[in-house]
């Protein structure tokens, strides 16, 4: 059973060259990317008990492409000096006591690589897949230009080797764009190792999400192109919980992502009425908070 929505593919293929243009159609993803990356790394390092200094990401312009391109430089806060040391994307990042390169990450629906490429630059072993060849070409070119080693594949989750398991499966802002969403999610979790985890993000199906995520974001502020989202495809956390009932996977954490207009910034929140992250793991495992 395919998860491909052909209309969605056609829509994204038209703008697939523009993933790394921070002022283009994917500009909103560039604005939320630092907090997304920080959250993902925090959850991975906590889950696998990696002892890291506080990690955040800062956006900076790099490259000399036709459009402005954005990469994310690691900012390592030294707990003793409280000084910030910025490392360029191309740098060989410090290896931790537990080598993170041994952690295999699968990014499903990677688009142009806004999440996968920075994670690979951090040192994780990343495989990233997308149904659109044009997305993979954009992602591969950007990673190559910035000296980042990563395995990009044109593939759907259904086409991926079913026997291959990963320490972390990531799927951000994707499930609201697919067909047969329950089967898609079941295929996602099949690729989680017994001690592994998954991180999903999507949009809740609430009146608040309709107003902010569609009317405001698409038609008033123009943060994303009109008709990017279909309200009927938004998912309530309870619906995902029910989809996982007959699996060995359960929801370990829900965390909201909200916009603070007073500070003009995005931040994590307990408010999951619109955008939210969901961490998944085996039912037998306790997930550290």
UniProtKB/Swiss-Prot annotation:
CDD domains: AdoMet_MTases. The keyword Zinc-finger does not apply. S-adenosyl-L-methionine binds at residues 36, 109, 130, 172. Keywords: Methyltransferase, S-adenosyl-L-methionine, Transferase, Ubiquinone biosynthesis. Its EC number is 2.1.1.222, 2.1.1.64. Pfam families: Methyltransf_23 (PF13489). One of its GO terms (biological process) is methylation. It catalyses: a 3-demethylubiquinol + S-adenosyl-L-methionine = a ubiquinol + S-adenosyl-L-homocysteine + H(+); a 3-(all-trans-polyprenyl)benzene-1,2-diol + S-adenosyl-L-methionine = a 2-methoxy-6-(all-trans-polyprenyl)phenol + S-adenosyl-L-homocysteine + H(+). One of its GO terms (molecular function) is polyprenyldihydroxybenzoate methyltransferase activity. It is an enzyme of class 2 (transferase). Coiled coil: none annotated. The keyword Metal-binding does not apply. It comes from the Bacteria. Pathway: Cofactor biosynthesis; ubiquinone biosynthesis. Residues 50-98 form the RPE1 insert domain. HAMAP family: UbiG. O-methyltransferase that catalyzes the 2 O-methylation steps in the ubiquinone biosynthetic pathway. NCBIfam families: RPE1 (TIGR01045), UbiG (TIGR01983). Belongs to the methyltransferase superfamily. UbiG/COQ3 family. This is Ubiquinone biosynthesis O-methyltransferase. The gene is ubiG.
């Amino acid at each position: 059973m395919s998860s491909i929505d052909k209309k969605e593919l056609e829509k994204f293929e038209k703008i697939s060259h523009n993933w790394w243009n921070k002022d283009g159609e994917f500009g909103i993803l560039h604005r939320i990317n630092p907090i997304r990356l920080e959250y993902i790394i925090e959850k991975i390092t906590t889950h696998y008990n990696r002892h890291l200094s506080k990690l955040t990401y800062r956006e900076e312009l790099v490259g000399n492409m036709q459009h402005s391109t954005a990469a994310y430089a690691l900012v390592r806060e030294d707990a003793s000096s409280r000084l910030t040391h910025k490392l360029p994307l191309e740098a060989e990042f410090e290896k931790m006591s537990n080598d993170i390169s041994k952690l295999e990450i699968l990014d499903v629906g990677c688009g142009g690589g806004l999440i996968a490429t920075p994670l690979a630059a951090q040192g994780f072993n990343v495989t990233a897949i997308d149904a659109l060849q044009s997305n993979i070409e954009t992602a591969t070119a950007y990673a190559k230009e910035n000296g980042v080693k990563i395995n990009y594949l044109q593939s759907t989750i259904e086409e991926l080797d079913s026997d291959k398991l990963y320490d972390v499966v990531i799927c951000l802002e994707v499930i609201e764009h697919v067909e047969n969403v329950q089967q898609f999610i079941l295929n996602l979790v099949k690729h989680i190792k017994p001690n592994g985890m998954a991180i999903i993000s999507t949009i809740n199906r609430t009146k608040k999400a309709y107003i902010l995520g569609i009317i405001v974001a698409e038609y008033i502020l123009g943060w994303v192109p009109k008709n990017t989202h279909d309200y009927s495809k938004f998912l309530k956390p309870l619906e995902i919980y029910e989809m996982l009932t007959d699996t060995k996977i359960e929801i370990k954490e829900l965390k909201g992502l909200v916009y603070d207009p007073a500070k003009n910034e995005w931040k994590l929140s307990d408010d999951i009425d619109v955008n939210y992250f969901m961490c998944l793991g085996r039912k037998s495992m306790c997930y550290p908070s």
